[in-house]
Amino acid sequence: MRKFRFRATYAAVACAGIVLGTTAAAHPSAGPGAPAGHYAGSLADGATWIADVPDGWNGTLVLFSHGYTPGPANPPRDAPTPAAAAALLAEGFALAGSSYAQPAWALGTAADDQLGTLAAFRHQIGRPRTTIALGQSMGGLVSAELAERGAGRIDGVVNTCGLLAGGVDLNNYQLDGQYALQELLLGNHDIPLVRYSSPADGQATANALTALAGQAQPTASGRARFALAAALMNVPTWAVGQPQPARDDYAAQEQAQYAWIAGGLLSFIDPARYTIEQPAGGNGSWNISVDYGDLFARLPDRDEVVALYRAAHLDLRADLRHLTAAADITPDLPAVRWLDRTSNTTGRLTVPTLSMHTIADQLAPVEFEHEYARRVSAAGRGGLLRQAFVQAVGHCNFTTAEYVTAVRAVRERLHRSGWGAIADPERLQADAQSLGLDGAAFIHFRPGPLVNHRRLAAARPEAWPWAAPAASPAR
């Protein structure tokens, strides 16, 4: 194992709009010639960055994009976990990452902040032979953006638990589920679902909807309708601390979905919606004109819902018709355009990309991977993308070995003309086990579709159904 040591950071100097922390012996040099140590600095927009270089640097920089940070604290991070940092450094990788210019939904500057961090690393420490962008959660969306616009600076990408369908689909899938909870279990529009004036408003909505879900559990009809709402919100049918339910154990699947809601899932989602609406300039989600019968027909968990509705002697088609007829939430068009411009993926990859997901992720549904692969294929870049799945439950619940293996796989791909078997689960599993760390669980898996995707028509807003004079007003 390579020894890693930290060195003190000294005074900052300004260069090309970048404020840099420096070590006494630091001089720009190529690849492994750079001195080992810890570096820190800041960018012109206020983002801060850190970097760590090990003894025996192998010449590859891992540029880490971190996930959502509620704030107000906004520290820079250069690895997904302390254990992953130690393991990557021991493998000879250098690490770097920024805070982004602001906490919370930072997509307005995040990709630029990461590229600015790379520029600072090159100036202060040295030019890496290769740079691999590694992203986690919201940072997975950032690294996916770098895969599209970082050619010449980024050589390869690892996305983990990424919000790969982008901010519009993120808000829309969450809206679909919460709208169904309110409409089917309460029967009115008294709980605000969008356009919050503060995080406290979002928390109040989360509390009210969580209470509704709990009140539904004692009855068969309540559980069936809750299951429909949970399925529309892509809530996993496997929960932390529970055995994975059998494919046809629909009662256990519904209980797992309820465990996620009772455990506080909405208390993260709804206050976070406020922090997305603020930089976007309004509500970027909608359900007016959405056909919930069409969505249901494509749901991965529709068998569960059908079974529970039958057991409760409820009319599923009637409930779906009601959801469609009552849907009247409209977007603020500038917010949709902002999210589409800053917080989205097109699939137009420019570098090899490996995307990794647990199969039961409550905050970044594994269905995002299906949507991401669809976009990449439609853009004609399917040969650059590989996806890896882990038999685990929870958001970003990866082992250290899985993180290191994913980075090693992309580095190997950069030395070959194609992927070959590099990202096959058997190959990934064997590599992870060979590290002697904390194990791995790579499996063959095919995610279902993200049915909540709405096609954007930002170039022709007059053609959008809600833009017509007869459309219901926003609420």
Segments and roles (model prediction):
Residues 1-28:
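Secretory targeting and sorting signals
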Residues 29-475:
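C-terminal His-loop and adjacent cap/lid subdomain of alpha/beta-hydrolase
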